């Protein structure tokens, strides 16, 4: 595997392999006072973000540094992008500098795929990792969600996962639907009709407009943020009505199975899609998702830059 651009790039076996690798990294670092492995020493990773990020960017940076890579952050607001430099020229510049991997977040769907074409036309350039491209894909988020589900539920096959909220603008919803169904889960989208994408009926999911009817037998409820920055208005009458119909309240939490969990990719809008107290409830796995993100991204970087043949990631510092 050269790049990670979409969940379509991965088979069920490859997904399971990455999740196993992430779990191995987690266990290798557990209890260490110094969280440092020599796995990527001498490698150079650039994060190139054209959109704001807290979790994804810091998680990738931490993942690279915990494997001893040199991680350099490029922000559109403080680079030559501000002067009008194209994505193509930015990518080629960083490739010429010596990048081993480029991690890109971009508002345009397909940007990561295009970047990979520019920097590695013959497969000999840096690996490209899609950290979110418009409403298209966010593969590492889906992987960390799957790892969290596996840890909390004991497995994914046969589980019912309900994804609630702004499906229309959510790359997380798309990536999770692809990954989870490959691993044998039932995925249900719950949203108002105005927040469902055109053609969603062809996706490997079931559509529901009634959140309450899906709670009792769900193994996990994944709440999504309403992405107001991608809306011009008119998608729902008011925040209050949205919270009433599609928010995770204490009353709705009480209807869930004892071992069912609540997830959220972040950032959370407390008081809108999730109640303040529910956000901090024991069944809510948000911080576990964040923690797993580091280990999943370690596994992805290791797999793309080094490969999984003949090298241990747990080699001790000499």
From Swiss-Prot:
Positions of L-aspartate binding: 83, 171, 225
Entry EC number(s): 2.1.3.2
Keywords: Pyrimidine biosynthesis, Transferase
Top EC class for this record: transferase
MF terms (GO), sorted A to Z: amino acid binding; aspartate carbamoyltransferase activity
GO process terms (BP): 'de novo' pyrimidine nucleobase biosynthetic process; 'de novo' UMP biosynthetic process; amino acid metabolic process
Reactions the enzyme catalyzes: carbamoyl phosphate + L-aspartate = N-carbamoyl-L-aspartate + phosphate + H(+)
Pathway annotation from the record: Pyrimidine metabolism; UMP biosynthesis via de novo pathway; (S)-dihydroorotate from bicarbonate: step 2/3
Residue positions binding carbamoyl phosphate: 55-56, 105, 138, 141, 266-267
One of the Pfam families matching this protein, by short name: OTCace
GO CC annotation, single: cytosol
Gene3D superfamilies: Aspartate/ornithine carbamoyltransferase
InterPro entries found in the cross-reference section: Asp/Orn_carbamoyltranf_P-bd (IPR006132), Asp/Orn_carbamoylTrfase (IPR006130), Asp/Orn_carbamoylTrfase_sf (IPR036901), Asp_carbamoyltransf (IPR002082), Asp_carbamoyltransf_Asp/Orn-bd (IPR006131)
Subunit composition and interactions: Heterododecamer (2C3:3R2) of six catalytic PyrB chains organized as two trimers (C3), and six regulatory PyrI chains organized as three dimers (R2).
Job description of the protein: Catalyzes the condensation of carbamoyl phosphate and aspartate to form carbamoyl aspartate and inorganic phosphate, the committed step in the de novo pyrimidine nucleotide biosynthesis pathway.
UniProt xrefs under NCBIfam families: asp_carb_tr, PRK00856.1
Family statement drawn from the similarity comment of this UniProt entry: Belongs to the aspartate/ornithine carbamoyltransferase superfamily. ATCase family.
Designated name of the protein: Aspartate carbamoyltransferase catalytic subunit
Source organism per UniProt: Corynebacterium kroppenstedtii (strain DSM 44385 / JCM 11950 / CIP 105744 / CCUG 35717)
């Amino acid at each position: 595997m050269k790049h990670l651009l979409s969940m379509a790039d991965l088979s069920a076996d490859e997904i399971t392999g990455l999740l196993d690798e992430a779990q191995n990294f987690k266990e290798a670092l557990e209890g260490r006072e110094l969280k440092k492995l020599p796995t990527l020493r001498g490698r150079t990773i650039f994060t190139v973000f054209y959109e704001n990020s807290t979790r994804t960017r810091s998680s990738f940076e931490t993942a690279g540094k915990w494997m001893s890579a040199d991680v350099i952050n490029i922000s559109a607001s403080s680079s030559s992008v501000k002067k009008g430099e194209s994505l193509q020229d930015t990518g080629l510049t960083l490739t010429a500098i010596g990048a081993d991997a480029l991690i890109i977040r971009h508002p345009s769907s397909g940007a990561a795929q295009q970047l990979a074409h520019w920097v590695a036309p013959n497969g000999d350039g840096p690996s490209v990792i899609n950290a979110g491209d418009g409403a298209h894909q966010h593969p590492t988020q889906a992987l960390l969600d799957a790892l969290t589900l596996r840890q909390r539920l004991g497995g994914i096959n046969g589980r019912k996962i309900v994804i609630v909220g702004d499906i229309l603008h959510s790359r997380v919803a798309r990536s999770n639907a692809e990954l989870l169904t490959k691993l044998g889960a039932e995925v249900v989208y719950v949203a108002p009709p105005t927040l469902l994408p055109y053609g969603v009926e062809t996706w490997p999911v079931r559509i529901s407009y009634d959140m309450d009817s899906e709670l009792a037998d769900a193994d996990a409820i994944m709440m999504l943020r309403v992405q107001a920055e991608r809306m011009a208005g008119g998608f729902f009458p008011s925040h209050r009505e949205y919270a009433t119909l599609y928010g995770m309240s204490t009353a709705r939490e009480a209807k869930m199975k004892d071992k069912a969990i609540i997830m959220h990719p972040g950032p959370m809008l407390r008081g809108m899609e999730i109640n303040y107290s529910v956000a901090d409830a024991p069944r809510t796995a948000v911080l576990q998702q964040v923690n797993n993100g580091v280990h999943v991204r370690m596994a992805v970087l290791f797999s793309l830059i080094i490969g999984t043949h003949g090298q241990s990631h747990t080699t001790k510092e000499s």
